């Protein structure tokens, strides 16, 4: 993960990827995961997303992973939550990890300040589903295969609600990056059944003139 790049983006306030409102596709399609109330939902590269607030109010515990500590701090400040902060040493690479944990709407929100590749399933605990709105599309092509494998490992092949964007990558540098259906299949087809729930026209704040299609996917455990 490119720590310096993301640290600089947050420091300079260049966080156009952050949405001030809950993502409507989360509200519309989350039920397709068919999770029991109280289940734990993993939100990779979570930033300070208010989607995590929605998940807690809907009755789910949240486990977020974020590289930039100021983003995690901002989430708890903006939600008026005083977190408990604990430090750990990563068994994967020896780096220092921080876990911020607090309560919202009776649910536990646990946000890890860490490179996602430094975490293990043992560290984060059991995961019932993954909500990926802005993680896969934030990563360059050479990182995505390893990322998809890490998510598979961290979640023990839990189902995913995944949002991607598709546009002419030659007309704009990412992030967010364009991801085709063929690329998605390369990343996930070995372990998941991939179902498209919706596609619709969208826009990018940094390139309003660009033709963009947003896709919503359900990734369920491959039964083969």
Residue ranges and their predicted role:
Residues 56-57:
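Gly/Ala-rich phosphate-binding loop of Rossmann-like dinucleotide-binding domains
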Residues 34-40:
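Short helix-loop-beta connector
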Residues 1-34, 48-52, 64-123, 148-150, ...:
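Class I (Rossmann-like) S-adenosyl-L-methionine-dependent methyltransferase catalytic domain
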Residues 116-118, 127-142:
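A short SAM/SAH-binding and catalytic strip from SAM-dependent methyltransferases
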Residues 60:
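Conserved acetyl-CoA-binding loop of GNAT-fold acetyltransferases
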Residues 42-47, 135:
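Class I SAM-dependent methyltransferase "Motif I" SAM/SAH-binding loop
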